Amino acid sequence: MTTAIRRAAGSSYFRNPWPALWAMMVGFFMIMLDSTVVAIANPTIMAQLRIGYATVVWVTSAYLLAYAVPMLVAGRLGDRFGPKNLYLIGLGVFTVASLGCGLSSGAGMLIAARVVQGVGAGLLTPQTLSTITRIFPAHRRGVALGAWGTVASVASLVGPLAGGALVDSMGWEWIFFVNVPVGVIGLILAAYLIPALPHHPHRFDWFGVGLSGAGMFLIVFGLQQGQSANWQPWIWAVIVGGIGFMSLFVYWQARNAREPLIPLEVFNDRNFSLSNLRIAIIAFAGTGMMLPVTFYAQAVCGLSPTHTAVLFAPTAIVGGVLAPFVGMIIDRSHPLCVLGFGFSVLAIAMTWLLCEMAPGTPIWRLVLPFIALGVAGAFVWSPLTVTATRNLRPHLAGASSGVFNAVRQLGAVLGSASMAAFMTSRIAAEMPGGVDALTGPAGQDATVLQLPEFVREPFAAAMSQSMLLPAFVALFGIVAALFLVDFTGAAVAKEPLPESDGDADDDDYVEYILRREPEEDCDTQPLRASRPAAAAASRSGAGGPLAVSWSTSAQGMPPGPPGRRAWQADTESTAPSAL
């Protein structure tokens, strides 16, 4: 016999977790804002600091690489010391590093400060998903993650617009200075509104962190510098060395029986595994496309940073409007068909855009594929996050969110590095003078990368051809979605749980809360009804893991893995014997 337990009044954040969510979104918003702002400012930074294309790309890649590496351990650090504490540390580091970026007088100092920024962002981001997973029940998590996606979309809109206006009026340094007051406000809100969740003891696999960091750095460095080094043998040796480090990292995680950096059990969930593949694909495509489109808009079309930002605005507006509705849809239905639709629109929109990237294309024709990209983003980001986290056990929340975000950042940094190599090769093939023509004018008054008239057409062709890479990669997202869609409908539970399901709602999430967060003055009432056979069968795995996942979430219950342990209690007891 089990008990139905009412939480005490002190646990208000489980009943109303929204203030904590909005407090966390301030820091998340600032990180997303920073990414889009720098993309718009890259041509101006390149012109004013008198640096070449290969160097300015490191302003983005260094940040993304430093962002990705600590996220693997940041989830565990959040579990050990509390996600609130790690969030505050990450936001503080990011804010101070933003000040350093704005004070930079050269490319070296700017890139170094961007690395510190990335570390702060890497510590902060996993705490948002981990906290959402722990304070929102499964049946409300889709709406919460829809709001999370809306914040990202709004940042994608505000970031380029604000960044373009700041670059045009005050200089590129102010795209970093603006983070300082926002960061201070975010720290104050987080300190008061984010709950202090229970800590879990963890060991930290620092050897694994070193292996993964070395592997990712070598791969990214080889890809990004390969074209400029004419793909000499030492470049290939660097890339192979990076792959070797990553292979050793995977082997070490499999052998580490104490507590691996990545608990491989999270990949037993097919949804989580394929969601990681697809988040890497969308991050690769999204980050990769920003580089050629931004350079095309400013160097070929002659748009200012502000006008370039306006060109991206339809994507953010459409994505922000649709994201909450998509969140409600996936709370009530299987998200896998939604993902297939989203990735299809993404591939079509990118192909459409590359066909329009010519010197004489009217601006209104460029806006149309950007609208389609907004539709694609709304139908990809939130469904991916919900699919990845819906079945995860609470004690894996920190590690799994760290893995998910690290894979996303790894996809982004690989997209940036691969695009750097691909763009450089296309520029060398299409333009007289090759990459040297991209150094642009020097001087503090240069805000737009200016090209001679006779090279604008070949440069536009090079940028258009560069868009083939993210468009091609987006196709793999469609393939990944098809692997999960069961056209016979067997993947979705056909019979819901009975209305009177006894103690079928006492899943691992409830047990976790009762064990980790005991409350005083809780009223307990014994439930006399026995577990229905249908509910017990679904909990034991009948119908497959997807059937368990979507049938429980449809009933508004936090999902638990199949095969939960049976409580052994006397029929006259008022509490489970395990408690």
From Swiss-Prot:
GO cellular component: membrane; plasma membrane
Residue intervals passing through the bilayer: 20-40, 54-74, 86-106, 142-162, 174-194, 204-224, 234-254, 279-299, 310-330, 335-355, 366-386, 467-487
Subcellular location: Cell membrane
Keyword Transmembrane: yes
Polar residues bias: start-end ranges: 570-579
Major site of localization recorded for this protein: membrane
Membrane-related topology note: Multi-pass membrane protein
Keyword Ion transport: no
PROSITE patterns registered for this protein in UniProt: MFS
Family membership noted in the UniProt record: Belongs to the major facilitator superfamily. EmrB family.
Protein name: Uncharacterized MFS-type transporter Rv1250
Native source species: Mycobacterium tuberculosis (strain ATCC 25618 / H37Rv)
Taxonomic classification: Bacteria, Bacillati, Actinomycetota, Actinomycetes, Mycobacteriales
